[in-house]
Structure formats: C-alpha cells, structure tokens
Amino acid sequence: MMSKLGVLLTICLLLFPLFALPQDGDQPADRPAERMQDDLSSEQHPLFEKRIVDRCCNKGNGKRGCSRWCRDHSRCCGRR
C-alpha cells in the first residue's frame, strides 16, 4: 500500500510541479515599477503621438493652434 502511494505521489509531483504554478509575486499588478517602465506604453508609441498632434494642433477653432487641454497635456505644444 505504501509503495502505491509513493508511486502516486511521485507521478503527481512529476506531472504537476509546485514551482510551475504562478506565485503572487509573478503577477504584473504586484510590480508597478516594471509596469511604469514598460517600453510598449501608449505615451511612447508613435501612433499615439500622431493622434495627439492631429487632435490638438490641427483642430483649434479652424486655425492651427492648441486647445486648452493640449496646452496642459500634450507634447505638441511644448509641454512634456
């Protein structure tokens, strides 16, 4: 009986190793510093900058200029 339990335990440990299960520290929500330094962030993406520039600098009351939101938040008006 003990040898059957030993074989079963060995098989279970080989098929489902404990280190393969995700731990709490492996979750992205637990690592905010790494999320903030992500190279794929939307602020650094070239398409995001183009949308901001198009929305901010080209649509200001029919003339080329920056809206109030863009003056406060956008790179197109010189604020970083």
Swiss-Prot record:
Keywords from UniProt, A to Z, are:
Amidation, Cleavage on pair of basic residues, Disulfide bond, Ion channel impairing toxin, Neurotoxin, Secreted, Signal, Toxin, Voltage-gated sodium channel impairing toxin
InterPro entries registered for this protein in UniProt:
Conotoxin
- List S-S links within the chain: C56-C70, C57-C76, C66-C77
Q: Name one GO molecular function term.
A: ion channel inhibitor activity
Residue stretch(es) of the prosequence: 23-51
Q: Which residues form the signal peptide?
A: 1-22
Task: List the record's Gene Ontology CC terms alphabetically.
Answer: extracellular region
Subcellular location field: Secreted
As annotated in Swiss-Prot or TrEMBL, what is the tissue specificity of this protein? Expressed by the venom duct.
Q: Where, per the database record, does this protein carry Cysteine amide? A: C77
This protein's domain notes: The cysteine framework is III (CC-C-C-CC).
- Spell out the family assignment given in the record's similarity comment: Belongs to the conotoxin M superfamily.
Give any extra note attached to this record: The analog R2-Midi BuIIIC is a potent inhibitor of Nav1.2/SCN2A (IC(50)=34.1 nM). It also inhibits Nav1.3/SCN3A (10% inhibition at 75 nM), Nav1.4/SCN4A (45% inhibition at 75 nM), Nav1.6/SCN8A (45% inhibition at 75 nM), but does not inhibit Nav1.5/SCN5A and Nav1.8/SCN10A (75 nM tested). The inhibition is slowly reversible.
The free-text function statement in the UniProt record for this protein reads: Mu-conotoxins block voltage-gated sodium channels. Extremely potent inhibitor of Nav1.4/SCN4A (96% inhibition at 1 uM). The inhibition is very slowly reversible.
Q: What is the name of this protein?
A: Mu-conotoxin BuIIIC
Native organism: Conus bullatus (Bubble cone)
Q: What is the lineage of its organism?
A: Eukaryota, Metazoa, Spiralia, Lophotrochozoa, Mollusca
